[in-house]
Design a protein with these regions (language model features):
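Cap/insert and terminal regions of metallo-dependent hydrolase folds
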Residues: 2-16, 216, 222-227, 233-321
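Binuclear metal-dependent hydrolase catalytic cores
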Residues: 2-226, 315-321
């Protein structure tokens, strides 16, 4: 008993010393961590080739564990994002990718959850890199209005940051975004929207009515091909252009769980939420449908994203699938 009291007393003393010195301890930890944090560049760890990472795998429903749709594509020296949902830019930085190194963004469509991180992305790229021109944003017809709106909303901020930091950090020539529109390809056709250094980025029309235009993107580089579906119902077009590819990144929504949410909303008298839950399944693919598309096309790997609803309880992923 006496020995136990001695051990407990020593432990309490150590805890007290640690608490009193917490600022010093934190300073030393930061001194060790900051060089690694600020000096990390994930691109330097990748082999030459075509690479994918998710900086956001969720949809519009709020969740502490999921961000809006955001896909990183690395092709040789090129670094792209497909869509920029909320928190995507911050996750991109947490993954160790250089915000100042982003070459362009490709938008699949203009639903809020796919574009609401654009302003933050443009600001972070501008203020942390050495770019001298705005961030190019490729998208189907209508992208010009979206980009003009973001630039207008952030125009005061551009001035504030330039006045504070000057041209070294925030040159006005690089502030904001610039739209690069393209015509949505006809049904069943591909349109090349970017081609450089052995990389081809092709757009395809997808089925997300009443949302129009809506596209997916196919990236081909170094003998590898991946296709990002964007938001779409199950579609033969996806399967046709995904035939034999290495990776299909496909959105998915669980109609069973959405149905449970609709029934619950009805029981609570929440007609608005019930109507939303009734509406959304008809322009998304289910996990099973996405898997069927991948199987029938002979895809090497399938990666789900735009996971709806968010996975919030243990075991829910099994129900979602």
């Amino acid at each position: 008993m006496k020995r136990l009291l001695v051990v407990l007393s020593c432990g309490l003393i150590l805890l007290g010393v640690g608490y009193s010195q917490r600022a010093t301890i934190a300073e030393r930890l930061l001194a060790t961590a900051l060089p690694k944090q600020l000096g990390t560049n994930q691109l330097e760890t990748l082999e030459e080739g075509l690479h994918v990472a998710l900086c956001g795998a969720g949809g519009p429903m709020p969740s502490p564990r999921a961000s809006g749709p955001c896909v990183v594509v690395v092709a040789g020296d090129h670094l792209f994002l497909v869509d920029a949902g909320a928190n995507g830019p911050r996750n991109f930085a947490r993954l160790g990718y250089p915000l100042g190194g982003i070459d362009a963004v490709f938008l699949t469509h203009f639903h809020s959850d796919h574009i609401d991180g654009l302003g933050e992305l443009a600001t972070l790229r501008w203020a942390t890199g050495d770019d001298l021109t705005p961030l190019p944003v490729y998208g189907p017809e209508g992208v010009e209005g979206v980009i003009a709106g973001f630039n207008a909303a952030y125009s005061a901020d551009f001035g504030y940051r330039h006045d504070h930091h000057g041209d070294l950090v925030a040159p006005l020539s690089a502030a904001g975004l610039t739209a690069v529109p393209f015509a949505t390809p006809p049904d069943g056709e591909l349109a090349t929207v970017f081609s450089e250094g052995g990389l081809a980025v092709e757009a395809l029309r997808v089925d997300h009515a009443p949302v129009s235009p809506a596209v997916g993107y196919r990236f081909t580089y170094g003998g590898r091909t991946l296709l990002i579906s964007g938001d779409t119902a199950q579609s033969d077009k996806i399967g046709r252009f995904a035939e034999g590819i290495d990776l299909l990144v496909h959105e998915a929504l669980s109609p069973e769980i959405i149905g449970m949410m609709e029934d619950t909303a009805k029981s609570l008298g929440n007609e608005i939420m019930a109507k939303i839950m009734f509406d959304v399944p008809d322009y998304h693919a289910s996990p099973r449908e996405a898997a069927e598309t991948a199987r029938d096309a002979g895809v090497g790997h399938l990666l789900y994203y735009h996971v709806v609803p968010p996975i919030i309880v243990p075991g829910q992923e099994a129900l979602w699938l």
